[in-house]
Amino acid sequence: ILANVLNGISYASILFLIASGLSLVFGVMGILNLAHGALYMAGAFIGLTAAGYWGNFLMGVVVAVISLGVIGLVLDRLFLSRLYKQFNEQALLTLGLVYICANVVMWIWGPWSRIGKSPAILTDSVTIGDFNFSVYRFAIIAIGLVIFGGLWWLQDKTKIGARIRAGMDNKEMTTGLGVNYGMISTAIFILGAIMGGLAGFLGAPIIG
């Protein structure tokens, strides 16, 4: 039972990274981003390619984060920032982006799935009772907890978080008080894209 619980928590940590990025974008910007799963996929392939090229897992993380940040910036500035509260247009655009991203990934990396390798320092297992549990899965759980704490601190304990909450309640009034909510929204979309891509790369050794 303990093995199933720990495995479930490690999977839940990956799902948390995906879902938190999606909910941030929808909650703060009101953007229904159906392409969030495509960002997850892009982060996985970009990170795996970088990690394989440099032979370093950390480089995969860095490249995936930077790449998804740039992709998020481009998507927000060129498309999504113009579609505030236009839910039908958002759905059509982001659904189209899913197909575009899927075809670009297939064109570059082919139709075959890939399994990521965990970093050498985290390849060992810990014996718990009668079973061995991967150190990498423990690391994923820890990363999920750290990000959860970081998001809570950002939202509830900082001035930026207060502005985010105010904008979620009333964007027009917040903007009227002199808050550059457009910049905050762009930063949130970039953060959401990064979290989706990071989940893809970190989850590759577990999910594939």
Model feature map: region roles:
Residues 1-17, 46, 57-60, 86-91, ...:
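Membrane-interfacial amphipathic/re-entrant helices at transmembrane-helix boundaries
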Residues 55-98, 104:
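Alpha-helical transmembrane segments within multi-pass membrane transporters and channels
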Residues 2-49, 78-89:
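Single transmembrane alpha-helix segments in multi-pass membrane proteins
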